[in-house]
Curated annotation (Swiss-Prot):
The lineage of its organism: Bacteria, Pseudomonadati, Acidobacteriota, Terriglobia, Bryobacterales. Keywords: 4Fe-4S, Cell inner membrane, Cell membrane, Iron, Iron-sulfur, Membrane, Metal-binding, NAD, Quinone, Translocase, Transport, Ubiquinone. Binds 1 [4Fe-4S] cluster. The keyword Membrane applies. Disulfide bonds: none annotated. The gene is nuoB2. It is a peripheral membrane protein. This is NADH-quinone oxidoreductase subunit B 2. HAMAP family: NDH1_NuoB. NDH-1 is composed of 14 different subunits. Subunits NuoB, C, D, E, F, and G constitute the peripheral sector of the complex. NDH-1 shuttles electrons from NADH, via FMN and iron-sulfur (Fe-S) centers, to quinones in the respiratory chain. Couples the redox reaction to proton translocation (for every two electrons transferred, four hydrogen ions are translocated across the cytoplasmic membrane), and thus conserves the redox energy in a proton gradient. Its EC number is 7.1.1.-.
Amino acid sequence: MEKPMASSGPAELFTRVDDYSVANAAAAANEGIVMTTLDAAVNWARKNSIWPMTFGLACCAIEMMSMSASRFDIARFGAEVFRGSPRQSDLMIIAGRVSNKMAPVIRHLYQQMPEPKWAISMGACATSTGVFNNYALIPVNQVIPIDVFVPGCPPRPEQLIYALMMLQEKIKNQSGTVKSVLNL
């Protein structure tokens, strides 16, 4: 495919753009042209720049902290640094048992997070109150919506990394992203 000549006006520019059909996509890729949808581009950016906020309530928090150490290095998945503020994060990782007194705090922090926001429930205690099944504990999915559940007591860092990858896949497959960004 030849490179387009210099245009003499806007009409010629539109003619050249229209010439790039799906059949010519391979040739266009060789010229450095990328074809995608706006939804796919926004979802790609979101899935590769997740800002997690830790909320460690028990022993699972130790495994969550080791996930960001050099051995596992979640930076390669786009989750650079754990944030301490809900206003700077879009992912909340709840690790440990949730008591009735802690539930309003979790809900309040989740509501402070900007849209879009996601949540991961890490460990048996956060998911189903675990071995401490008594009147004072509740599963975290009764407090906030959970996107990914990570089983285990405590789950290994590899399991949490896999949960992060599952969340990235969920973000990638979302539709209507641009409409929600533009409030349409």
